[in-house]
């Protein structure tokens, strides 16, 4: 039978080992590195039309779609990325070409595009956004508004290389 010896020398040695392990990060819980990539949302690609034109505004405007685009892992802002936006609005249904447009992110990875007021379809006022330029994996989003009276909606992308 083995007997454990817990004298002062053994306790100090064990305490020292624990302190070294803790300082080196060996006792920290596992964590995700940085920013996890955005997954496509169900219904995000509904009525998608490849190649919507880059524009300053869709239709007569009055509603703002905005957000950011970052790199998975380190969260660095991604400038010059094309984001396509479409929705069911007061000026047209989401499958109609005039309801689609695209914009580019600025140097901070931010985008903003004015469009007509989004109105409910199938009970939920929502927008559609897509990153589909090829350098990173394609992502489709379908954010839902809390109320049809809101005049803006945000969506954020974290992209991973294709």
For the regions a language model picked out, list residue spans one by one.
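N-terminal secretory signal peptides and thylakoid transit peptides that target proteins
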Residues: 1-22
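Domain-scale detector for complete catalytic domains at protein termini or as standalone homologs
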Residues: 15-18, 22-28, 131, 139
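Beta-strand-dominated extracellular/periplasmic modules and repeats
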Residues: 30-162
């Amino acid at each position: 039978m083995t007997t454990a010896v817990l004298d002062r020398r053994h306790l100090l040695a064990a305490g020292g080992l624990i302190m070294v392990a803790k300082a080196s990060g060996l006792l920290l819980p596992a964590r995700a590195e940085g920013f996890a990539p955005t997954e496509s949302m169900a219904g995000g690609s509904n009525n998608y039309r490849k190649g919507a034109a880059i524009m300053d505004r869709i239709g007569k405007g009055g509603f703002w779609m905005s957000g950011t685009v970052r790199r998975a892992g380190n969260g660095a802002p991604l400038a010059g990325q094309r984001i396509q936006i479409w929705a069911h609005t007061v000026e047209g249904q989401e499958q109609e070409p005039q309801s689609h447009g695209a914009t580019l992110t600025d140097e901070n990875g931010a985008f903003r595009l004015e469009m007509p007021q989004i109105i409910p379809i199938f009970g939920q006022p929502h927008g559609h956004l897509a990153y589909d330029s090829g350098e990173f994996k394609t992502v489709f989003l379908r954010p839902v508004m809390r109320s049809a009276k809101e005049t803006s909606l945000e969506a954020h992308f974290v992209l991973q290389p294709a």
